[in-house]
């Protein structure tokens, strides 16, 4: 089977990619995520962040992509801007943002282990999820939706929002920019037409 992703020596096939996207989509729905909701991802490009991005799109929700290099104040402002109730946070960055996130009981913070898909998970320091806060582990998140039926794919609509990214803020505060499914499809077509695999 063709390889879809490579990450620190781990190779993930297209079949595994689709299976993981479907699993994450079921878990998102089990936490009440619906079409049009904004789900924040603050992570590097790990396989799990990719699964989450496509699972969010499958439901018809919008991925709010946040740089881990933001200050805690910038992060909370971007989350509030789109009323995101669910945050997927890479474990390496949670200590930096913890104080800004744990005070809001309405939000759920899913802790994504950055080395989860590689053998390095056995030797890397593990973030300890605080059971007394709004944090949950990636493993718990996946278990929450495991028994659900597969999520239906939200049908295509022209210019349907898929992701929100942010400008650099060189002349002031960074601004949210909503990207449509069409913009991502055009990018994929450009790669295909250039012979890039």
PLM segments and residue spans:
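N-lobe entry segment of adenylate-forming
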Residues: 1-31, 35, 59, 116-132, ...
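Conserved AMP-binding/adenylate-forming
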Residues: 7-12, 25-70, 82
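Conserved AMP-binding A3 loop
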Residues: 13-15, 162-188
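Conserved structural elements of the adenylate-forming
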Residues: 18-23, 146, 177-197
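Short beta-strand elements of ligand-binding domains
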Residues: 43, 66-67, 107-115
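Conserved ATP-dependent adenylate/AMP-binding module captured primarily in the ANL superfamily
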Residues: 70-101, 187-197
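Conserved pre-ATP/AMP-binding loop-to-beta segment of ANL
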Residues: 129-166, 173, 196-197
């Amino acid at each position: 089977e063709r390889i879809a992703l490579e990450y620190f020596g781990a190779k993930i096939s297209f079949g595994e990619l689709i299976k993981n996207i479907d699993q994450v989509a079921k878990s998102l729905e089990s936490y009440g995520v619906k079409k049009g909701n904004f789900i924040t991802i603050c992570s590097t490009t790990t396989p799990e962040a990719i699964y989450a991005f496509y699972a969010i799109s499958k439901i018809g929700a919008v991925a709010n992509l946040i740089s881990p290099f933001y200050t805690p104040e910038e992060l909370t402002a971007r989350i509030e801007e789109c009323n995101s109730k669910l945050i997927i946070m890479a474990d390496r960055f949670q200590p930096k943002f913890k104080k800004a996130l744990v005070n809001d009981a309405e939000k759920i913070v899913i802790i994504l282990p950055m080395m989860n898909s590689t053998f390095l998970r056995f030797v890397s320091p593990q973030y300890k999820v605080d059971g007394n806060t709004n944090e949950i582990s990636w493993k718990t998140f996946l278990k929450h939706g495991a028994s659900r039926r597969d999520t239906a794919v939200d049908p295509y609509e022209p210019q349907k929002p898929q992701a929100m990214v942010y400008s650099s803020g060189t002349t002031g505060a960074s601004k949210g920019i909503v990207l449509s499914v069409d913009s991502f499809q055009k990018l994929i077509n450009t790669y295909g037409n250039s012979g890039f695999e």
